[in-house]
Structures are given as structure tokens and as C-alpha cells.
UniProtKB/Swiss-Prot annotation:
Xref: PANTHER family: 30S RIBOSOMAL PROTEIN S12 FAMILY MEMBER (PTHR11652)
Gene3D superfamilies in alphabetical order: Nucleic acid-binding proteins
Functional description taken from the UniProt entry: With S4 and S5 plays an important role in translational accuracy. Interacts with and stabilizes bases of the 16S rRNA that are involved in tRNA selection in the A site and with the mRNA backbone. Located at the interface of the 30S and 50S subunits, it traverses the body of the 30S subunit contacting proteins on the other side and probably holding the rRNA structure together. The combined cluster of proteins S8, S12 and S17 appears to hold together the shoulder and platform of the 30S subunit.
Protein name: Small ribosomal subunit protein uS12
Xref: Pfam families: Ribosom_S12_S23
Highest rank taxon of the organism: Bacteria
Amino acid sequence: MPTINQLVRQGRKSISTKSDSPALNFGYNSKKKSLTNNPAPQKRGVATRVGTMTPKKPNSALRKYARVRLSNLIEVTAYIPGIGHNLQEHSVVLIRGGRVKDLPGVRYHIVRGALDTAGVDGRMQGRSKYGAKRPKKK
């Protein structure tokens, strides 16, 4: 417990929180060639690499991911959710925040059904998260 004198001299330090998805906090000023403070909920980018990686122990799978160069020129690794995808190099994608716990370094998700990313085919439940249209009634 600090004394009153210590509090007068130094004061309380406010806790600063670190962003979970830092690349979404910046824009790019092409005239000045510098990053600007321009936070956004999603950002557009171009896939520079599409592949699979294996998760940390104790899980085992081949998780699909894409390396994406964002519109602010920051390059990030993003997870491709759902079963099957149509992404390849130079596909234009929309990313949102949200990490994948068992993939180190993956802090972003690709939004299915937006831009060049197709929705998941044959998805009946939780469709909005995977960009799947409502199936036609017979």
C-alpha cells in the first residue's frame, strides 16, 4: 500500500491494453508513404500464399490458412474457416480479427462469402458465419 506522499510524487499508472489484432488499427497514406491511425473492423487484402499448417499439441489436423497483404501494406496470416475453399494466390479477401488458439501466429479470420471468397457449399446450420445462402425449399 503506497503512502499519500508516494502517490503525490508518482501517481497511479493506468493499465494499457494491447490490441489482439494490431494490423486492423492502421491505414496507409500513399502520399506520405506512412501508416496512419485508422482503425477498422475488417480490412481488404490480397492473398500472397495459400496453404495448410499443423496445429499445436495435442491437436492434429491440416488447418487451411492464407498469407494476406492488407490494403495498409501489412502482411498477416489469416485462417480460412469452413470445409473447402476456392482461394488461391492473388485472390482478394476480407479479413476480420479473431485468433485460432492452436495455430501460433494466426490472429485473423477470412470472411467467407465476401469479395473473392465463396461461401461454404451445403452448409445448413450456422450459415451466416460461413457465407452460405439459405437453401431453396422443395
